[in-house]
Amino acid sequence: MVDNSKTRVVVGMSGGVDSSVSALLLKQQGYDVVGVFMKNWDDTDDSGVCTATEDYEDVKKVADKIGIPYYSINFEKEYWHRVFEYFLNEYKKGRTPNPDVMCNSQIKFKSFLDFAMDLDADYIAMGHYAKTVKDADGLTHMMRPKDGNKDQTYFLSQLNQDQIKKVIFPLANLTKPQVREIALANGLATAKKKDSTGICFIGERNFRKFLSEFLPAKSGKMVTPDGKVVGEHAGLMYYTIGQRQGLGLGSTKESTDPWFVVGKDLKKNELIVEQGYDSKLLYASRLKASDMSFFTGKPDHDVEFHCSAKFRYRQCDVGVTVKYHADDNTADVYFDEPARAVTPGQALVLYQGEECLGGGNIDAAYQEDKQLQLV
């Protein structure tokens, strides 16, 4: 049996069941485990309760139960500058960002990793559902976990080799129900705690209300692709490509089909809408992605390859051909079949079978050579 007692793992504990079980499993495997609660946001919910205080109390209970030391670290300043300012700037540009991807690359696997190394950690761990394997050359590869329904490789897609080689994913071969069972069997305080949902710093709060506290909303016209005014929008930042809900538009003489957001015109402050799920304006043949990241290192030359991809969380993989450009670290990605509602600002994530190759940020979508008016 391997002696792990001299290997220190610092576990980022959120106060949720997943990171609680991660810490427990590592402790059971004999590692020298230290729990750390990260406070990334000054979060008070709509009822005035500071959820971080409640979460830290749960971390204390779990750490005491499994017998590990615990600390709390505040990354609010780093989070504001590296994640939240990016989030706001993307919305100002009319894009729909994914701050959780940025939070992982800049905070959880950067600021937290640095802090853990100062605690003499050999590895870090959290409650993510992902898996890593090491090849014969010593390179660490990111793989999909056993629980495909909880697969979080999408959100980890912009980490690099130096980051993932320092990570253990204790939940790699477990399903969420199994994690709950382990927590219950070991009497962990978080065993029945519900999962957090939505963007981490918004939590259960109303999204529009939250965003309006930081960005002034400017109402404007809702127009059809040919310019006909059909309504008024509350602010372009509140809408995303392909959105159906919340438009407040009814059927017309021509059609009873629901309306969808098919574009944005920032200069005119107009939201472009059209009836019908299959609006041609929602389908792209290719996209342009920037800031590409690959787990095993960026190619030092242009390369073309076929793989599968996701351009939003939880969607099924779609076949793509990737043309990577080494000079500016961008990629042109061609879909095997036209793809619906490709949204600038979201993450593009590439897969080869069970392996997650990496990803980048979606900048634009095209129908052949024509750029879709998505921002």
UniProtKB/Swiss-Prot annotation:
InterPro entries xref list: MnmA-like (IPR004506), MnmA-like_C (IPR046885), MnmA-like_central (IPR046884), MnmA-like_central_sf (IPR023382), Rossmann-like_a/b/a_fold (IPR014729)
UniProt-listed Enzyme Commission number(s): 2.8.1.13
Record-annotated site: Interaction with tRNA: H128, Q346
Function description: Catalyzes the 2-thiolation of uridine at the wobble position (U34) of tRNA, leading to the formation of s(2)U34.
NCBIfam families reported in the protein's UniProt record: PRK00143.1, trmU
Any single biological process term in GO: tRNA wobble position uridine thiolation
Protein name: tRNA-specific 2-thiouridylase MnmA
Cellular component GO terms, alphabetical: cytoplasm
Disulfide bonds: C103-C200
Subcellular location per the Swiss-Prot or TrEMBL entry: Cytoplasm
Transmembrane domains' residue ranges: none
A single GO molecular function term of this UniProt record: tRNA-uridine 2-sulfurtransferase activity
Active-site residues (renumbered): C103 (nucleophile), C200 (cysteine persulfide intermediate)
Gene3D superfamilies for this protein: Adenine nucleotide alpha hydrolases-like domains (2.30.30.280), HUPs (3.40.50.620), Translation factors (2.40.30.10)
Pfam families cross-referenced by the UniProt entry: tRNA_Me_trans, tRNA_Me_trans_C, tRNA_Me_trans_M
Superkingdom classification of source: Bacteria
Reactions catalysed: S-sulfanyl-L-cysteinyl-[protein] + uridine(34) in tRNA + AH2 + ATP = 2-thiouridine(34) in tRNA + L-cysteinyl-[protein] + A + AMP + diphosphate + H(+)
Residues bound to ATP: G12, M13, S14, G15, G16, V17, D18, S19, M38, G127
PANTHER family associated with the record: MITOCHONDRIAL TRNA-SPECIFIC 2-THIOURIDYLASE 1, TRNA 5-METHYLAMINOMETHYL-2-THIOURIDYLATE -METHYLTRANSFERASE
Family: Belongs to the MnmA/TRMU family.
Region of interest: Interaction with tRNA: 150-152, 312-313
Chain positions covered by the region annotation Interaction with target base in tRNA: 98-100
Keywords on record: ATP-binding, Cytoplasm, Disulfide bond, Nucleotide-binding, RNA-binding, Transferase, tRNA processing, tRNA-binding
